[in-house]
């Protein structure tokens, strides 16, 4: 029985990354789940489009989404649980400037969201890909949601 404890403990330790945070004279250890894959989405110039417009990832994958804003306007990336909520989220975003135009009062309707990326800035968000289906990712900066969106396809 003791032979199994060491390999299992080692496997669990290998699946978790740790970050160290200095807090005065002591160090605090934070466990973080390992990232399975990194996806890069970009915005360029003055066009209100994400590139690529479609992504496919296996459900349950832990993703680091890196958004590179090479555009001339600020943008964010928001993944709602349902495309039916996008219009309401976009309206609520107008009053959410303090939170990067992400309506945090509606946080339960969101799978993931980035901070606001100024032109030339790169931001990241980490999330677990939801159950199989199609999910829309959208920019909720005022006036962008009608044309700046893409599709995240969650695969089995």
Feature names for model-found ranges:
Residues 1-9:
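Bacterial N-terminal signal peptides that target proteins for export
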Residues 9-19:
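Bacterial N-terminal signal peptides
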Residues 21-36:
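A eukaryote-biased signal for short, well-structured alpha-helical docking elements
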Residues 26-29, 107-156:
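Extracellular/periplasmic metallocenter environments
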Residues 33-62:
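N-terminal edge beta-strand
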Residues 47, 102-111:
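Short beta-strand and strand-turn-strand segments in soluble, beta-rich domains
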Residues 54-79, 123-131, 135-136, 153-154:
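Beta-strand cores of secreted/periplasmic/IMS beta-sandwich domains, seen most often
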Residues 83-96:
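Short aromatic-acidic-glycine turn motif
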């Amino acid at each position: 029985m003791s032979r199994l404890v060491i390999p299992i403990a080692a496997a669990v330790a290998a699946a978790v990354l740790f970050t160290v945070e200095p807090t005065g004279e002591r160090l605090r250890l934070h466990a973080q789940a390992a990232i399975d894959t990194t996806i890069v989405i970009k915005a360029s110039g003055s066009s209100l489009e994400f590139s690529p417009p479609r992504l496919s990832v296996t459900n349950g994958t832990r993703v680091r989404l890196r958004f590179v804003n090479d555009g001339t306007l600020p943008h964010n990336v928001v993944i709602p649980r349902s495309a039916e909520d996008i219009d309401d989220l976009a309206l609520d975003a107008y009053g959410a400037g303090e939170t990067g135009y992400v309506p945090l009062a509606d946080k339960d309707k969101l799978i993931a969201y980035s901070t606001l990326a100024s032109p030339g800035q790169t931001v990241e968000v980490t999330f677990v890909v939801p159950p199989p289906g199609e999910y829309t990712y959208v920019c909720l900066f005022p006036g962008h949601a009608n044309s700046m969106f893409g599709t995240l396809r969650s695969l089995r």
